[in-house]
Amino acid sequence: MDQEQTPHSPTRHSRSPPSSASGSTSAEPVRSRWSPKPEQILILESIFHSGMVNPPKEETVRIRKMLEKFGAVGDANVFYWFQNRRSRSRRRQRQLQAAAAAADATTNTCDQTMMVSNSLPHHSGSDLGFGGCSTSSNYLFASSSSSYGGGCDNQSNSGMENLLTMSGQMSYHEATHHHYQNHSSNVTSILCPSDQNSNFQYQQGAITVFINGVPTEVTRGGIDMKATFGEDLVLVHSSGVPLPTDEFGFLMHSLQHGEAYFLVPRQT
């Protein structure tokens, strides 16, 4: 009975990552400290972007054989790389969704602020309770005219009093209107400071790309490869196509926002 139960004991570990096709255990310790080379990363990223995000065991073995041309690698290394790559992809997707939601919230807040500032009432002097200014002006003018001899008749005094009253009301109305306009513009600029700044990066032509898996901001248009990355490196798209440069070392085509690229040594 003991001999019949012994072969079934290893089945509890059936969920472990695939082992190397050679069957040797010497290649397995590499997976814990494996650092893929740029050529290996290029192959893995190309396969991942082609839609194969969770390759089966047979494909894992085939991918491992392709990667072995550039360095030591085991099946477990390939298995864990795709596992980590899926996690990074999901995390990046969540970050992009959160950034889009924050941008929408900022836009809605600014729209509401503009509506509130535009709906602020513009009161004249009489609406704010300063209608007594006309009475004061009439009284001062009447007192002044009587003190200096009262040489004018009642009709001329009435005309001058009306003129002073209208002038005072117009001056106060203009000052009040100017105050509310300044207040509205200040509220809008304080609560919505990012309207102009949010477009600054786009106007400058800055885009974000992933170089060797790291988000990097670059300028839109031709990039000086020699000054930026050195003379011994070539920029390759995740599809495996190298990016051409002109005789001065500038990229002939602009990088695409959100795309993945890799720096690989120049083949001599």
Swiss-Prot record:
DNA-binding residues (ranges): 29-93
The organism's place on the tree of life at top rank: Eukaryota
Principal cellular location given in the protein's record: nucleus
GO cellular component, one term: nucleus
Cystines in this chain: none
UniProt record similarity statement: Belongs to the WUS homeobox family.
Name of the protein in question: WUSCHEL-related homeobox 11
Gene that produces this protein: WOX11
